[in-house]
Structure formats: structure tokens, C-alpha cells
Amino acid sequence: VRILKERVWNELSKNVAVMPVSTKIQDTILIIKIKDDIFINLNDAGPMSHRFIKKVVKNYKRKFLLSISGWGDADMINFYDKENNFIEPLAAKKHPVGDYLSLIAKLFSANYVIPFSSFHEYQREDSIWANRYVTPMEEYKNGIHHDITFVEPFAFINSEKDGDISSLPLKKKKLVIKKSCEFKDNWNDVLEVDDKKIVKEYFDKFEELQDKVGFINFV
């Protein structure tokens, strides 16, 4: 086990070095240097520490941004109002994902974007309804800015030769719907009064939700 030092280059081999950057939300961004190429792996950390990272990568020619993206289906969309009507999430507006990726790339002075950590779908019988908000693969390049190069996901990038980028010929896996009980969840379980306290204490721990969620009904 090797503990990597933060905000400095940690050399892994002759051509590869990494720099972890922790953020104020207790997440980490990983900057990867392969020869003269830079890969900024945000994963789901968001556009944090961009001023520092921009300085680190400013002298490199090819800078690739890897970031979670999409319409926003994975971000707490299962909400209802007091009349038990489903609240349509922001994901329903289907904002061009390429525009979002381009803006984030420019924040870090990256000139290439690669969709990353974004290729999920829902397979449980009690969550497959959310698949209508999942971003199709072809939508990730929609809205890409003219000065940003889009790289298809699952690509091979040759760091010794500019322009040598090729995508792997992958096929989408067939969706197999599974029952929630396979995951130890049973909607027929009877909840007790003490469970209400457990639920309330759980959500009360998230300070950021206090001014965003008006109420929690225990049903």
C-alpha cells in the first residue's frame, strides 16, 4: 500500500504520474499525467479546485476531462408533493449534455472531453421507471462547443501520437429486470413506529437538504 501525497506529482513509472486533489466536500479529483497528456478525472466530484488544477495543467497541450455527466437522473429525483403527485425532475428538460461537458472542460482549461462514470441504467422492478430519464449514449456529444474535442467513451488514446484515438466496438448489454426482494428489499414489510425516528434522524444528518426538502412523510 502506498499513500499518495496530495497536490504533488506521484511518479508511478517513467511515463506515468498522478496527483490527487481532495476537495472541501470530502471527495477527490485525480490528475493523471501520461507522457505529455493530462487526464483530469473528476468522476462525480464536480468542478472543485479548478483554479489550482488549471495552474497545474496550463503548459500541457492535450488535456482530457473525464467527468460524470448526463441529464441528471442519478441525483435524487424520486420526489412527490403533498398531494402525492410526482415532481418532474430537472432531467426531464434534457439539457444538451455536450454543452455542460464543454463548460466544465473550459473551467479546467481542458480541450478534450470523455464521458465518464455515466453509463448506468436501472434494473430493479421498483426503479426501472427512472430509465426514461437516463441519457442515451448518442446524446453526450449533443451541444459540444466547436473548440472542444469530443472523445467517444471506452476509447484507446495513444499518448505518443496526436490524433491516434479509436473507440472500442462495444455493444449495449440487454436489460434484465430483477425483483427488489433479490436485494433484500421487501415492500410488504410492515414498518414500526420506531422506524419513523430512524428515517428522520437519517435525513436530518444532511444539512444541505434542510432548505431543499420541505417535509418527509412516513407511510
Model-predicted segments: where are they?
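A generic short-segment signal for beta-strand/edge and adjacent turn/coil regions
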Residues: 1, 9-11, 33-37, 81-85, ...
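Solvent-exposed, charged interface segments at domain starts and junctions
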Residues: 1-2, 86-87, 213-219
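Short acidic-hydrophobic, aromatic-tinged amphipathic segments that line or gate anion-handling sites
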Residues: 2-6, 149-153
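Core dinuclear metal-dependent hydrolase active-site scaffold
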Residues: 4-62, 66-73, 157-204
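Noncatalytic linker/hinge segments flanking ATPase motor cores
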Residues: 23-25, 44-45, 79-86, 106-112, ...
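Cap/insert and terminal regions of metallo-dependent hydrolase folds
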Residues: 52-144
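C-terminal, active-site-flanking charged/polar segments
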Residues: 139-147, 155-158
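Extended non-globular C-terminal regions
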Residues: 200-219
